[in-house]
Amino acid sequence: PIAGSMVLAAILLKLGGYGMIRMMQILPTTKTDMFMPFIVLALWGAILANLTCLQQTDLKSLIAYSSISHMGLVVAAIIIQTPWGLSGAMALMIAHGFTSSALFCLANTTYERTHTRILIMTRGFHNILPMTTTWWLLANLMNIAIPPSMNFTGEFLIMSALFNWAPTTIILLGLSMLITASYSLHMFLSTQMGPTQLNNQTEPTHSREHLLMTLHLIPLMMISMKPELIT
């Protein structure tokens, strides 16, 4: 069920990251090469999850792997235990919690009208449900971490912290973010552009669906503009 996916991506996945932050306090905080294999493993896992997103034809699976890839960046930031790294990890977990939950909500909106999650079968929604296309665009821009969103703040802090700790990590980070932008654009174009496959009369969007998306994106934008709300 989609509600379970929203709770899993928005809350349960982030609880694991919070638990790691608490448990990492027992390890040494000084710079040591002991952490390098784990950082490389976390970033490589993020890249592999992003590449898996590019191969997905199932919309729900694509969003799920997207959440996994972002948590790879969070894990890498938590491991080095610097103030910027931990701040970026917390910011990205909160921001991506809203973003991934919103994407799952939009996937359910599409599924209720097409009864399929296959990307090629959900094309052409910009002609049928233009307001939903706007929500898709905003959610994908947040997923890409466009400035001045909180997603961008989190990723920028993580990138700065990892670069200061080990400059070579910028290669894996840059590759991960490039692939993230690629699959986000692919997801948006596959669900909204092109000729529609629907032959029957499509049910219009309901006020509750717009309210649900508003309750996801408005808090995220407010936190992006005023981070003091969560500090």
Curated annotation (Swiss-Prot):
<keyword id="KW-0249">Electron transport</keyword>
<dbReference type="GO" id="GO:0008137">
    <property type="term" value="F:NADH dehydrogenase (ubiquinone) activity"/>
</dbReference>
<comment type="function">
    <text>Core subunit of the mitochondrial membrane respiratory chain NADH dehydrogenase (Complex I) that is believed to belong to the minimal assembly required for catalysis. Complex I functions in the transfer of electrons from NADH to the respiratory chain. The immediate electron acceptor for the enzyme is believed to be ubiquinone.</text>
</comment>
<dbReference type="GO" id="GO:0031966">
    <property type="term" value="C:mitochondrial membrane"/>
</dbReference>
<feature type="transmembrane region" description="Helical">
    <location>
        <begin position="1"/>
        <end position="21"/>
    </location>
</feature>
<keyword id="KW-0830">Ubiquinone</keyword>
<keyword id="KW-0812">Transmembrane</keyword>
<dbReference type="Pfam" id="PF00361">
    <property type="entry name" value="Proton_antipo_M"/>
</dbReference>
<keyword id="KW-1133">Transmembrane helix</keyword>
<comment type="similarity">
    <text>Belongs to the complex I subunit 4 family.</text>
</comment>
<dbReference type="InterPro" id="IPR001750">
    <property type="entry name" value="ND/Mrp_TM"/>
</dbReference>
<keyword id="KW-0472">Membrane</keyword>
<feature type="transmembrane region" description="Helical">
    <location>
        <begin position="156"/>
        <end position="176"/>
    </location>
</feature>
<keyword id="KW-0496">Mitochondrion</keyword>
<dbReference type="GO" id="GO:0042773">
    <property type="term" value="P:ATP synthesis coupled electron transport"/>
</dbReference>
<keyword id="KW-1278">Translocase</keyword>
<dbReference type="GO" id="GO:0015990">
    <property type="term" value="P:electron transport coupled proton transport"/>
</dbReference>
<feature type="transmembrane region" description="Helical">
    <location>
        <begin position="34"/>
        <end position="54"/>
    </location>
</feature>
<feature type="transmembrane region" description="Helical">
    <location>
        <begin position="89"/>
        <end position="111"/>
    </location>
</feature>
<dbReference type="GO" id="GO:0048039">
    <property type="term" value="F:ubiquinone binding"/>
</dbReference>
<keyword id="KW-0520">NAD</keyword>
<keyword id="KW-0679">Respiratory chain</keyword>
<feature type="transmembrane region" description="Helical">
    <location>
        <begin position="128"/>
        <end position="148"/>
    </location>
</feature>
<feature type="transmembrane region" description="Helical">
    <location>
        <begin position="63"/>
        <end position="85"/>
    </location>
</feature>
<keyword id="KW-0813">Transport</keyword>
<dbReference type="InterPro" id="IPR003918">
    <property type="entry name" value="NADH_UbQ_OxRdtase"/>
</dbReference>
<protein>
    <recommendedName>
        <fullName>NADH-ubiquinone oxidoreductase chain 4</fullName>
        <ecNumber>7.1.1.2</ecNumber>
    </recommendedName>
</protein>
